[in-house]
Amino acid sequence: MESQQLSQNSPNLHGSAYASVTSKEVPSNQDPLAVSASNLPEFDRDSTKVNSQQETTPGTSAVPENHHHVSPQPASVPPPQNGQYQQHGMMTPNKAMASNWAHYQQPSMMTCSHYQTSPAYYQPDPHYPLPQYIPPLSTSSPDPIDLKNQHSEIPQAKTKVGNNVLPPHTLTSEENFSTWVKFYIRFLKNSNLGDIIPNDQGEIKRQMTYEEHAYIYNTFQAFAPFHLLPTWVKQILEINYADILTVLCKSVSKMQTNNQELKDWIALANLEYDGSTSADTFEITVSTIIQRLKENNINVSDRLACQLILKGLSGDFKYLRNQYRTKTNMKLSQLFAEIQLIYDENKIMNLNKPSQYKQHSEYKNVSRTSPNTTNTKVTTRNYQRTNSSKPRAAKAHNIATSSKFSRVNNDHINESTVSSQYLSDDNELSLGQQQKESKPTHTIDSNDELPDHLLIDSGASQTLVRSAHYLHHATPNSEINIVDAQKQDIPINAIGNLHFNFQNGTKTSIKALHTPNIAYDLLSLSELANQNITACFTRNTLERSDGTVLAPIVKHGDFYWLSKKYLIPSHISKLTINNVNKSKSVNKYPYPLIHRMLGHANFRSIQKSLKKNAVTYLKESDIEWSNASTYQCPDCLIGKSTKHRHVKGSRLKYQESYEPFQYLHTDIFGPVHHLPKSAPSYFISFTDEKTRFQWVYPLHDRREESILNVFTSILAFIKNQFNARVLVIQMDRGSEYTNKTLHKFFTNRGITACYTTTADSRAHGVAERLNRTLLNDCRTLLHCSGLPNHLWFSAVEFSTIIRNSLVSPKNDKSARQHAGLAGLDITTILPFGQPVIVNNHNPDSKIHPRGIPGYALHPSRNSYGYIIYLPSLKKTVDTTNYVILQDKQSKLDQFNYDTLTFDDDLNRLTAHNQSFIEKNETEQSYDQNTESDHDYQSEIEINSDPLVNDFSSQSINPLQLDKEPVQKVRAPKEVDADISEYNILPSTIRSRTPHIINKESTEMGGTIESDTTSPRHSSTFTARNQKRPGSPNDMIDLTSQDRVNYGLENIKTTRLGGTEEPYIQRNSDTNIKYRTTNSTPSIDDRSSNSESTTPIISIETKAACDNTPSIDTDPPEYRSSDHATPNIMPDKSSKNVTADSILDDLPLPDLTNKSPTDTSDVSKDIPHIHSRQTNSSLGGMDDSNVLTTTKSKKRSLEDNETEIEVSRDTWNNKNMRSLEPPRSKKRINLIAAIKGVKSIKPVRTTLRYDEAITYNEDNKEKDRYIEAYHKEINQLLRMNTWDTNKYYDRNDIDPKKVINSMFIFNKKRDGTHKARFVARGDIQHPDTYDSDMQSNTVHHYALMTSLSIALDNDYYITQLDISSAYLYADIKEELYIRPPPHLGLNDKLLRLRKSLYGLKQSGANWYETIKSYLINCCDMQEVRGWSCVFKNSQVTICLFVDDMILFSKDLNANKKIITTLKKQYDTKIINLGEGDNEIQYDILGLEIKYQRSKYMKLGMEKSLTEKLPKLNVPLNPKGKKLRAPGQPGHYIDQDELEIDEDEYKEKVHEMQKLIGLASYVGYKFRFDLLYYINTLAQHILFPSRQVLDMTYELIQFMWDTRDKQLIWHKNKPTKPDNKLVAISDASYGNQPYYKSQIGNIFLLNGKVIGGKSTKASLTCTSTTEAEIHAVSEAIPLLNNLSHLVQELNKKPIIKGLLTDSRSTISIIKSTNEEKFRNRFFGTKAMRLRDEVSGNNLYVYYIETKKNIADVMTKPLPIKTFKLLTNKWIH
């Protein structure tokens, strides 16, 4: 009803469409775009001009009074939500009806018709002209406005009269729409509607009411005819005819953009910089301007930007103009770097430069005196021409007589006065419209000089000449200082007079200064005025005061000049002037002399060094710097000659004009050695420049004929196949290309041979890179397929086919597509080395097999067949008759994870790859009657360490009875660094020693007996691939010459590959005579079960042991006496350092047994022989490495024997898989399995927003997460994390710069709920961060060292936390993130200001920020080589992201640092550390109990109690606890793993969780677990049942010993020195592929601070080499820790190294430099000698039984493990 009434009572809709809102006065000259844009000064002029053109009635000059125009009473309805008008209330629709304002109805009540057919639309015409003034909207009028009778004349300068508002003029054309919008916006502002007008970003101050919407809608229709609107406006109105605000918003945005472009150009053209602000600020300002112009599609080139910047440089920066004046390729970044360098130099100089006070006597009246200086400054004011033709300097007549010519200001050079011209029109844009006062630049060269003339300068106070030829009565300068316009010193060599002889014979003389460091000879008018001579610039003459003309002056350029012909020469040579100078105290040294004295250093380095007083007794002013910057030293040019730099992409400009296949690159690779004659040794490659199409051709040699044949073939192929002619071939200068034959070939065919310059291989990058790519592919394909090396070219050819078919990163098409060829048909390609069966069409017999196994190589060039290699025939065939073998591989891929290292995240595992032993390897013979410096090699393990008698130089057969057969043992293959070494399954272990079958065995039908004694350790925790003991496959392959019958029984043997060999003779158990070992067995062997009563090995005498020869070929001088204890004496002071002093206070085991050196009863040291334990709890894993005898089945377990406790029910089960129902199994492709592992996501311990809040059913937890969420939001806003002033549209931002964000929620260890707003850095584009920046945290060794020093020195330990640390670091890159979810702005973006958590660069930004603050504000210094360790004289700080640990003797020093930190950062004190009682800390996951002056205990009991049960490992909390993490005698079977793919990924995932946690704990403080962790980590990708069980056992042991702690006690206060010791150990060959395990433990003042267990990266051939490798790994870290300790604690330090290898100590001690056994061995040994002697390192021997590093290299029996660890962890 209301809407109908409104429509019925509004007959005069068109008559009141021009009413406006009246409010307080708005100035008529207010800019209509004041909300969003800057004021335009021409707006008011345009407004007045337009308004004056409107039709007016001449008879009136003001608006007639209208008594109806009275203000209504405020409406009784409530005001709108967004506020009222400033003076009046709003009307309801009913009141609007009563006052005839119904036409301002709600837009929703209007008829929804087209724009021009709307009932509110009114088109003015001549009969109904537009009103001159409009009553306000809030003014009630009883009668509607009569448009027909309102014809008042409008005053031109008024926009409002009384309560009326001047309406805008009517739009007259589409082109004037932007100008019309300005007036319309002003009209709305004057109507008090400015706060609802959107700015260029679409923002408004309040929402409009319905009446206001109708008002704007109607007025816009009235003054903007639809047919005159621009197209984009019509498109908006056609969608929504009432959407006027969108039109205004886009109009304002367009005007704002145009206005901003204008401002940016003006700002860029008027850049000025003198160093008053920082260079960074200047760079940011300029870059911002250029970026805004670029966003508006205006690209400013680097050259233009550099020119504009150079134009505005002044002061010390002005010299850059000359530097860049001749450069054509100017880079903006380089210029900014130069500016930054000068700014930094000036900043440092200003801090260090003392104030100078110089007094002048003779010329004191010439310069103005100031409190700080009395320097005479040359002023060069040159008058500028105005618009008239007369120069401004024409008033020079008055200079001599007028007081205007004063020297009061002559000591200051006028700066360039710049008056920027305002642009008169929006469309006018002229760069450089400036008026500058011209002046010469005196200290740089100029091209404007008029030769043989003096420049007349009315502003110069002194006359300066560059040549002493005209200087009379010259005297050396001693007190005058001259500066130029840039306030740079001008050195003055001499002072004298210039004598003039003018036209009429008039002679005069003026004073002048001689300096060669100016661009012009300057003639001062003030000096001439003193002689009553003036310059008349109207007549261009020099005149006397009486008008007599003395000489003409010449105008050249902008200046006036006087010829030097009027000067009288002095007849004094320049040498004379220099001699005068040298005779005085002001003697300047020539720069070439100083250049030679200072080692031919460059100019800038010398000058900067003198400025900073780096060289004493020589000042910068003492040197003659003239022409120093351009001085060319011949010796430097010769000695420092370098190659020219290759600019990336520079080659392209020379080759753009070539078409496909016209420009080729070629190169030859080879030779490849050790190949059959039939295999090629070289290949030659060709690459087309345009298409990057590649060809390769095999070569057997590099003769001219071979190369010529290839070129003939390639040219013919290109000509016929691509209809192209080769024009240029680029190649290097090898003799195969530069010979006469090939040169003649090119000449006859008109081909240009383009050679590289001498020794410039980088210019041949295309061909070189192709060869590198092909060879990388070749090595990969051969290694993956396992094919022999002589097929290397087939791999290269296969790679070429594939590379031609793939799109390279720099091209959008493949080479084949560029060449116009079809894409590669994938159905015609097989994997390189794919096993196939080839049909034999011509068998030898009809009953012979028709199929031959082979391996696919590559598609044939000459047919539609495939090239296939047939190993049995040793040839390749081209055929299509083949069948692919499914699920077969050319070889078993082997992956061998090497060293387990720990990064800061403690989750990554790294591995090194190892090569495998091929069948065609060479075999190396070893004599079984000899021994090496290690124990004899057994079936699996080669004994780790020698103890005694391993240095004997005698070689006597210990048995004297029978000669034992010589065994052939395969030596490890030399590792090829280019072949991938990743292996999952360790392959068959090397050849094993023979075994003897004992028929009395109770378990397997016979006991396996070795022909050697038991090694020092009976077994190892390693991997093998072998059958169960007792089977014939356990026997190794012996060559025919080994099969000698010595009364041995026949035993059937088998090769490793499975081929049966004839029976060979072995020793029977009735006539065995074994030799004895030459080393004392280890602890676990000596303490073997004493119940064994049937030994089968006869023990020889000690003499035989001592005289046993060794395989080790160390020269005799490397061996020492058995009873000697060698040590290294680094210097003379070492006499005070003994082995006892090094060993003192170390947590070594207490031994009651005899020393290993006590050999009085050798038989007591020989261990009893164990029987085999095949019924182990891990499923009967065999121990084929030990010697066995029959033993009682029932006997009690003791601590020294193997013990496996059950921690999971499945561990007790036997291998019952055969009883399970059959299930579907799938053989895993191991390569694919690795890819699958990479896709496995880590365990997620956090919650997403929907999980924590949206769908969280736990209301209590949900409320806590909501509270944490709002706390995080408030913190982000408080830190100004993003720009809150503007939201960006997603479509307007480059997607690379958009970073996804998310909230993560978790519950901290202390029970608090945490919310964190993070960026998805894992999907961050590489272009948005600098990959060179690194995020540093304190190294764990540094933290442990600091804690140890704190205990010994009674330090207070304070723990701090900085809230939202990353948010304090600014971000340099332009990045955007999505707003938080509560804002509901899904399509908007926020620009980041701070380093948000999760960004790649956030950690590095925070590190640089806090580092700078600690150094500059806290007076800290970072310890060199140890990031995040800071110290000063009182406090040491360890920084781990936002956690800080403070150490200090004085607690007040810590508090002082805390106070300083709180000034900048929100710093929380977690634990102040005051008090003398026990204090508990939680530092980076370590639970620390600290009582000053007494002890420190480090553990993780609470954390492990919480985390271990969550690993889904069935722990056995009530059962018997395990007493060791693993036991010797258990091997990881390496049978082929058959498992479902999903189950495989699940188990790998489980292994990652378990080993990841174990790694974290071991790295922190459980160093005794590192060996087991490292070994299991190597099998993460081989999650067999056995590996999982061993991992469960490790986790169970961690659970049982979770309360163990690393115990430290305070060092004895009587010891003045710090003692840093490394204990080293190695276990030779106990890892797959002959690898050795090495380990080190580091101790500071008797406290274990770190440990390392890793597999040796190189293959060692003896125990000595393994020990040397272990020692060489320990020394670098030992030296680094030594530096850290000395920085943190100034006490002297003693460095010691302990090893149980006497041979290693002997080699280090020896001075013999004869050739070593191999290169690696010798290099390591020589390096150790240098490091030990050069670092004051003491090396001593430690008994093996006391070597606690043993736990790092091998599994130990329980008793031994406890003995070695109970002193330092319990």
Curated annotation (Swiss-Prot):
UniProt xrefs under InterPro entries: DNA/RNA_pol_sf, Integrase_cat-core, PolX-like_BBD, Retrotran_Ty1/copia-like, RNaseH-like_sf, RNaseH_sf, RVT_2, TYA
Classification lineage: Eukaryota, Fungi, Dikarya, Ascomycota, Saccharomycotina
Superkingdom as given in the UniProt entry: Eukaryota
Subunit note: The capsid protein forms a homotrimer, from which the VLPs are assembled. The protease is a homodimer, whose active site consists of two apposed aspartic acid residues.
Organism encoding this protein: Saccharomyces cerevisiae (strain ATCC 204508 / S288c)
Binding site for Mg(2+) 3: 1625, 1667, 1700
Keywords tagged on the record: Aspartyl protease, ATP-binding, Cytoplasm, DNA integration, DNA recombination, DNA-binding, DNA-directed DNA polymerase, Endonuclease, Hydrolase, Magnesium, Metal-binding, Multifunctional enzyme, Nuclease, Nucleotide-binding, Nucleotidyltransferase, Nucleus, Protease, RNA-binding, RNA-directed DNA polymerase, Transferase, Transposable element, Transposition, Viral release from host cell, Virion maturation, Zinc, Zinc-finger
Residue ranges of every copy of the Integrase catalytic domain listed in the record: 656-831
Biased composition (Polar residues): 1-39, 49-60, 399-408, 415-435, 915-929, 1009-1024, 1065-1082
Protein's name in the database: Transposon Ty2-DR1 Gag-Pol polyprotein
Residues in RNase H Ty1/copia-type domain copies: 1625-1767
Low complexity: bias regions: 369-382
Residue ranges annotated as motif Bipartite nuclear localization signal: 1193-1227
Region named RNA-binding: 295-397
Domain called Reverse transcriptase Ty1/copia-type: residue spans: 1353-1491
